[in-house]
C-alpha cells in the first residue's frame, strides 16, 4: 500500500514535469515513436504509483516493488507494450490482465483507450484504485478476478495486454480478442520474451520480440 505523500514527495511531484520530460525524451531515443504513447508517458505522474520512499526513483528506467511480491514495470517496457498494442490504429476497447499499481492502466487511459482491467489480488486492486484517483484517472473498469479467464461479459476486445508472464497463451483470452485485435504479453518461465499476437480469420499471427522479466501470471483470486 502506497503511503500518503510527505511534503518532500509532494515537492518532488511539483518538480516532476521536467523529470517526466526527460523520461519521455529517453523513450524516444530508445525507439518509441508513437506520439500518443510518448504524450501519455509524459502526462501520467508515475511518482503517484510508487511508495513515497521510492518517489525520487519513479522516473528512472527501472522496475520498482509495489508490495505483495509485485512490481511496477520500467517505463520503457510500459511504453513498448503500449505502442505494440495501439500503433497504427485507434486504441479501442482494451483488456489489461494484471492491474498492479494502476500505472499501465493510467497510460492506456491517456492514449484514449476504453480500459477494462482485472487483478487477482484484492489488496493490490485497492491500491490501484487509490493511485488512479490520486492521478484523477477514474474511468477504467477495475475487476477483482482471475485474469486467465478474462472478462467474457465485456468481450470482444480490440486489444489485450498481459502484465505478468504466462507459460502459454490463455485460451479464454484468445477467444475474447476481436478479429483484427492484438495481444501483447510476456511468455516463458526462467527465460521470457515479449510476444505480439494478431488475430486474423486464419488464426493467430505470433511475433517474438524482446527478452523481458516479469512476475508469473497466476490463477485464482487472492
UniProtKB/Swiss-Prot annotation:
GO terms for cellular component: cytoplasm. Its EC number is 2.1.1.77. The gene is pcm. This is Protein-L-isoaspartate O-methyltransferase. The active site is at residue 73. It comes from the Bacteria. It comes from Chromobacterium violaceum (strain ATCC 12472 / DSM 30191 / JCM 1249 / CCUG 213 / NBRC 12614 / NCIMB 9131 / NCTC 9757 / MK). Keywords: Cytoplasm, Methyltransferase, S-adenosyl-L-methionine, Transferase. SUPFAM superfamilies: S-adenosyl-L-methionine-dependent methyltransferases.
